[in-house]
Amino acid sequence: MWLMLVPLLRGSVACCVRRLPERIAGLHCDSEPSHPVKSSRMSRTLMSLVVLIVAVYLLLCTALFFFQRSLIYFPQPAAVASADSRLKLSMADTEVWVSTRERSGPRALIYFGGNAEDVSRNLPEFAEAFPDYALYLLHYRGFGGSGGSPSEQAIAEDALALFDQVAVSHPQIAVVGRSLGSGVAVRLASQRPVQQLILVTPYNSLEEIAAKQYPWVPVQWLLKDRFESGKYAAHIRVPTLLLAASDDEVIARDSTQRLLENFPKDVAVLKVVPESGHNSISDRPQYWQWMGDVLNR
């Protein structure tokens, strides 16, 4: 049986050997076009990947442009809302509320809070620390029952309206702004005759802060509300106190320093509250002491 298979195997092997060059040649001819095909497929894959990355980037930039104010403003309700502690500003397009502590006399204090602050919570402490002042704490649009939506321009208009209304009965007005509100305060002080200006955890511009947080985004083209405090600081002529937190995790010290340098010479002074953060600065005794040194003279 095995001997009968030998001639058959020999014939098969011989046939295969004779056809091997043809098959090799065939393989060679078939394989030559495969390199351009693979290269073309790779190019298309890379191009698709680049297009996808660009599309995602543009989508993110578009989302940031349209939803940026939801990343800046975080409206809070008012905790202190009794009728005798609130003033209504009737603006052209909405109504804006102000938490107040009325006091007769020439002195008044207007306060602008942070981007997620319920300013009414400051009333008890402000009333105790500054007993001779009538107090006016502005609720930004969308905050504390105020109508409308917040924006830099709208808040600036509300601040001017509040100042003009308060000035009718209080000729000596001090302005205090904290965090985001420091930008509101310095802009107002450049346009109205304030008595003193205090800026708590202030910044040179919101654009600078946003550019550091989103270095991959063309912030200078997308940002709507820039809060360019440094630009307005150059026009301030009244005594100004800047209070920085020693361990501020939101506002970099160099931003506050650049703001200080934009004030005219001998107008502003910077003090650093020790062992304090961006949100805890008002828990330190120096915060109240240094503000009192300015306001309670």
Residue ranges of each PLM-predicted region?
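An N-terminal hydrophobic leader/cap segment in hydrolases
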Residues: 49-89
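Membrane-embedded segments
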Residues: 97-165
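Gly/Ala-rich beta-loop-alpha elbow adjacent to hydrolase catalytic centers
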Residues: 177-181, 185
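Active-site nucleophile loop of the alpha/beta-hydrolase fold
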Residues: 199-208
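Short beta-strand/loop motif that positions the catalytic acidic residue
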Residues: 236, 242-244, 248
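Short alpha-helix in the alpha/beta-hydrolase fold that links the catalytic acid
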Residues: 252-261
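Short glycine-rich catalytic loops that host catalytic nucleophiles or stabilize transition states
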Residues: 270-276
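Catalytic histidine-centered segment of alpha/beta-hydrolase-like enzymes
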Residues: 276-285
